[in-house]
């Protein structure tokens, strides 16, 4: 609706008008969901290109307890935050059931509101774990997966359905992590940092693929990213990508079909504050001295205490405890990684292909400065 950042308030919006440039304008036949994450207004359900109920009341902000974070704003008459996740699950199961007798393939993209803030496990899941509401909320996600698998199996569609389970980032460090760690649960496992940080705890995610008859209980350690699903689906469907399509996406169809490996050799990460890093299968070069997110060091005065760049051997040191940026044994690798990052920025892409323009105003001075120092330009 474009009410933020341009002087308009939400009260100026006519919610009865169709939504433009939404999912149904971007290739989806049907959509049911919410406009943003559950803590951000307007608090309405959107079905296709219309809200299901015109906002008629206000949900007050709740920012004292970050686990229950709500920024506050207008809400529809049929909208209750604690019912949102169950409603999305219900619509998803209905959609799967509607495809029961169809001979055509179907695609369901299910970006759930859990376990993002506010942490609101349904009553039947409260107290299911010993680590508090967040753990209960995660169990609720597990049950969602159970329901989807059960429905596919009931409809005799499980054997020819590919299920992908993933996350957009690591666990948020502000949702009661310290209390969970005291109880023996470590959301980031052995990895450093959390959501928004440049470190592994912010970027390593679960990526589980289920394909009946293709996989047993196996693990693949190839370097892949969620953005690789674009090129992967294109290859799977024999779709020829245009020059400016999927400029950072490498197909992992060879991995999923068990016919080979991905062509990806490195991967760019971005922290919440925009700082970049480049990783290979062994090394991770961070173009900044801090976390770039919420974890120490964050304040400029603290970041200044450390070298302006960070280098980690993520094979030998997956917890990123030792910054080896000054180790001469890695001088050549660091030079090559710097050159690669500069090339990606200049070419507007990290895949082979014609040079394209970047679709952002970010100049990535952090990268340019280090490259100037390296090459004397």
What role is predicted for each listed range?
Residues 1-7, 34-38, 108-118, 165-172, ...:
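Short, solvent-exposed turn/loop segments enriched in Gly/Ser/Thr/Pro and often Arg
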Residues 1-74, 173:
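Catalytic-site neighborhoods of secreted/periplasmic enzymes
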Residues 8, 76-106:
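Catalytic-adjacent loop/helix segments of enzymes that bind and process anionic phosphate/sulfate esters
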Residues 9-19, 23-24, 118-121, 127-133, ...:
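Histidine-centered active-site microenvironments of extracellular/periplasmic hydrolases
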Residues 26-29, 101-108, 156-163, 204-205, ...:
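Loop/turn elements at helix/coil->beta-strand transitions in domains of secreted/extracellular proteins
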Residues 39, 146-155, 181-246, 250-261, ...:
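Substrate-binding rim/cap in mid-to-C-terminal beta-strand-loop elements of soluble/periplasmic
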Residues 41-42, 46-52, 58, 92-137, ...:
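Active-site His/acidic residue clusters
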Residues 229, 291, 300-310, 314-377:
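Long, internal low-complexity/basic segments
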